Amino acid sequence: MISENLGENQTEKIPLKGRTLKELSEIMITLGEKPFRAKQIYHGLYVNRYETWDQFTTFSKIFKEKLEELCSLTHLQVVKQLKSVDGTQKFTFTSESGNGKEFEAVWIPSGDGGRKTICISSQIGCTLNCKFCATAKLEFQGNLKAHEIVDQILQVEKIVGDKATNVVFMGMGEPLHNYFNVIRAASIFHDPDAFNLGAKRITISTSGVVNGIRRFIENKEPYNFAISLNHPDPKGRLQIMDIEEKFSLPELLQAAKDFTRELKRRITFEYVMIPGVNMGFENANKLVKIAKSLDCKINVIPLNTEFFGWRRPTREEIAEFIALLEPAGVPILNRRSPGKDIFGACGMLASKS
């Protein structure tokens, strides 16, 4: 486990951000240090939010010089920051190596100031081609490492001067195609000795990677889970989501049922509303049948990426569709779309300004 993300050659420093406490302990032992040093570093990184070895004032000069030589506190570079009229802020990052690969995170405060969500990315670009998502139009440039995922939170919170109450893996990329690094980062967010976010305040989303869902179930991951459904019919779903070719809707729904049965937790279906594509009575009726078959809630989201040739539904169309879903007897949320003016809303992350 220690060798994960060490770099391409032995001359590169060991990145310490994005490591669990257990991993840090193993690294310290490898470096000939006592395991308790790991807890000091862990606390310094995630509680005190130190960014340089000089800030670890309890460390001896010799120990700090050793860490400086062998280990890295690498952090992301913010190359662009945009603020919406509604208070949403979008951050475009690149890694410290300056490789030019950009990815984004979004700070989303609620209107009353109580809920503060950070939407983070798990990949640069995406491996999938969802027709309603701007990220799908980007070239896939790789998975983000755990320290690059964790540092999105650290950098955003530092800049806005506030702490997030919720974290959602709904930015660029398919989280379950980067399972190891996503779960490692989520465990750090959840750890009481690090970010101390409750498991119910961390949501991992997927477009429907069934083998990843089954791995999630097998590992009994404690986090909230959302599936980007977007169409209640296999043929219709295939037209807008290419993942349907690999993991069919029946397979996906069976995995969702297994999730609720095994983990005893409600699953969330995300549903981007596209007029003429997945709305109307017939689609609503099929979605109601799906919802009745398992313990779930439905988040409906008006289409934001109008530049794909579709239009955003009107308020009347949204209200009518939600009314058609009410017989399902499950919670239905019309999810707001903050940050549209800065291309920070759902489906719009593509390093655009």
Curated annotation (Swiss-Prot):
Catalytic activity: adenosine(2503) in 23S rRNA + 2 reduced [2Fe-2S]-[ferredoxin] + 2 S-adenosyl-L-methionine = 2-methyladenosine(2503) in 23S rRNA + 5'-deoxyadenosine + L-methionine + 2 oxidized [2Fe-2S]-[ferredoxin] + S-adenosyl-L-homocysteine; adenosine(37) in tRNA + 2 reduced [2Fe-2S]-[ferredoxin] + 2 S-adenosyl-L-methionine = 2-methyladenosine(37) in tRNA + 5'-deoxyadenosine + L-methionine + 2 oxidized [2Fe-2S]-[ferredoxin] + S-adenosyl-L-homocysteine
Subcellular location: Cytoplasm
Record flagged with keyword Oxidoreductase: no
EC number of this enzyme: 2.1.1.192
Top-rank taxon: Bacteria
Residues binding [4Fe-4S] cluster, per UniProt: 126, 130, 133
GO biological process, one term: tRNA methylation
Alphabetical keyword list: 4Fe-4S, Cytoplasm, Disulfide bond, Iron, Iron-sulfur, Metal-binding, Methyltransferase, rRNA processing, S-adenosyl-L-methionine, Transferase, tRNA processing
Cofactor comment: Binds 1 [4Fe-4S] cluster. The cluster is coordinated with 3 cysteines and an exchangeable S-adenosyl-L-methionine.
Chain ranges of the Radical SAM core domain: 112-341
Extra facts: Reaction proceeds by a ping-pong mechanism involving intermediate methylation of a conserved cysteine residue.
Family: Belongs to the radical SAM superfamily. RlmN family.
Entry protein name: Probable dual-specificity RNA methyltransferase RlmN
Biological classification of the source: Bacteria, Pseudomonadati, Spirochaetota, Spirochaetia, Leptospirales
